[in-house]
Amino acid sequence: SNTQPTDDTWSGTGQAAKLATKFVGIGSIGKLAAGNMYTGNYLRTEGTNGVLNFGKQFTQRPTRLKGYFKYTSVEINKSNDEMKYLIGQPDTCQIFIALGDWSEPVEIRTKPSDRKLFDKNDPHIIAYADMYSGKSVTEYTPFTLELEYRDTDRIPTYIVVVASASKYGDYF
């Protein structure tokens, strides 16, 4: 897995998650995959592509997501044809949170011919916040994502929280 537990934590106690982008496969068969963690579950693999469900049932109205992160940005050196313009650019990590009134978890498909990624402009989204970093952050640094509510009359049914070692991991 590209996501592993680590004892290297902001407080020096407990555990954290270490997300890494690396090649997953045997020999030349496989693909570059971003380390990630998310609320939801992995459904299945189709070829070398994933099908996931984003979200867990949730009906509260938080105002922010707080945490700590550190990140080592490296130069992008592999990409599919669609994102070749990124080669030579620094990779970017991503964290986002969304509250929505979906009737079920949000299905994500990474296969290019059947791609369905998370859309932060989805009309079901009630509140959203995100952050990106394309610079290396060598020490644990606090972050706060202030949720921007688009509608205060609707009640959330799901929460989606995603952290990825590579914002463009679905395109490698």
Describe each region flagged by the PLM:
Residues S1-K66, G88-G100, V106-R150, R154-F172:
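Aromatic (Trp/Tyr/Phe) and Gly/Pro-enriched flexible surface segments
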Residues F69-L86:
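Short amphipathic, basic-aromatic surface patches that mediate peripheral association
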